[in-house]
């Protein structure tokens, strides 16, 4: 894992900004655009403000082994942290989607009587500045779902917490058939493990990834992504979900999935989408559990980040 300086830094990179603007490609007059995604950026540090004691308590409760941090050399541009009782996230003010969303799923959240609200209270997030956030109109007629990262189904006991999952800061543009079927079933699997084992820590987010960048013979240093609406909400190429919980042996266990943002057949073998946490970190520039960097956590670090289960866990969770 990697660490980063936690001191407050400026958001603006005078060198990178005009390059990225020059690379922006608008296609026709539709609400969907294409733009060049830089695969590797120059050094940049995100701003981090201090937390109140209440915020620190929420982060400690929801983010296992520390709040995710940026890896050095991976400037994610201007971001805004959002802390709510049910989740903590970091939202990209450039892409208008979260980089990651942390949750803790336990008996206080799951197995309640709440169903999906009707109508669903999708809305822009007042904690983010207008012009640097997704708006409802960006998704309208875009052809993409407003895809939850912290799902509404993870909050079935308290209406206010479920309503909080409907802020657009917790959404990414997601292919509807993917969002409503294959991805939803993955969310249900994770909830099942949390219920079976009593709790689970979950980190979910988008990826901008082109497999050609893994091979020096095909890597170009950039690739095309799509964006929707007047606010240019970035459409991720992939989504990841990480689950960490205690197995039947009492030891911490982890499993992570990466799925392309596309349509899937009716029956999906989720084993095909298992990846290591380290693999995801290397391709997102995010250190998901920074406290594992401490020397006393070296063995656990190795176990959680590098192990790749060969099979999807059974319904009652891992050994």
Show where each model-derived region lies.
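Bacterial N-terminal signal peptides
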Residues: 17-27
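N-terminal secretory signal peptides that target proteins for export/translocation
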Residues: 1-11
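Hydrophobic alpha-helical segments and their boundary regions
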Residues: 11, 17, 136-137
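Domain-level detector for secreted/extracellular nuclease and nuclease-toxin modules, and
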Residues: 25-319
């Amino acid at each position: 894992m990697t660490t980063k300086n936690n001191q407050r830094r400026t958001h603006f990179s005078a060198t990178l900004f005009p390059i990225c603007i020059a690379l922006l490609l608008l296609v026709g007059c539709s609400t969907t655009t294409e733009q060049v995604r830089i695969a590797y950026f120059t050094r940049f540090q995100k701003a981090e403000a201090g937390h109140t004691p209440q915020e620190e308590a929420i982060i400690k409760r929801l983010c296992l082994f520390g709040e995710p941090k940026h890896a050095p050399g991976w400037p994610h541009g201007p971001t805004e942290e959002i802390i709510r009782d049910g989740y903590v996230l970091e939202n990209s003010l450039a892409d208008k989607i979260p980089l990651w969303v942390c949750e803790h799923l336990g008996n206080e959240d799951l197995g309640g009587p709440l169903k999906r609200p009707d109508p669903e209270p999708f809305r822009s997030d007042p904690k983010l500045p207008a012009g640097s956030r997704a708006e409802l109109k960006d998704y309208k007629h875009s052809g993409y779902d407003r895809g939850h990262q912290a799902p509404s189904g993870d909050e079935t006991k308290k209406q206010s917490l479920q309503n909080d999952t409907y802020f657009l800061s917790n959404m990414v543009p997601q292919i509807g058939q993917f969002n409503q079927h294959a991805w939803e079933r993955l969310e249900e699997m994770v909830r099942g493990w949390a219920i079976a084992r009593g709790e689970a820590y979950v980190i979910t987010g988008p990826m901008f990834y082109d497999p050609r960048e893994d091979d020096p013979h095909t890597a170009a240093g950039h690739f095309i992504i799509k964006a929707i609406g007047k606010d240019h909400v970035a459409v991720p190429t992939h989504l990841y979900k990480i689950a960490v919980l205690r197995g039947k042996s009492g030891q911490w266990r982890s499993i992570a999935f990466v799925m392309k943002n596309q349509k899937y057949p009716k029956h999906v073998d989720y084993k095909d989408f298992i990846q290591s946490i380290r693999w995801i970190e290397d391709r997102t520039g995010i250190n998901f559990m920074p406290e594992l960097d401490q020397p006393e956590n070296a063995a656990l670090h190795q176990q959680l980040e590098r192990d790749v289960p060969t099979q999807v866990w059974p319904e009652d969770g891992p050994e």
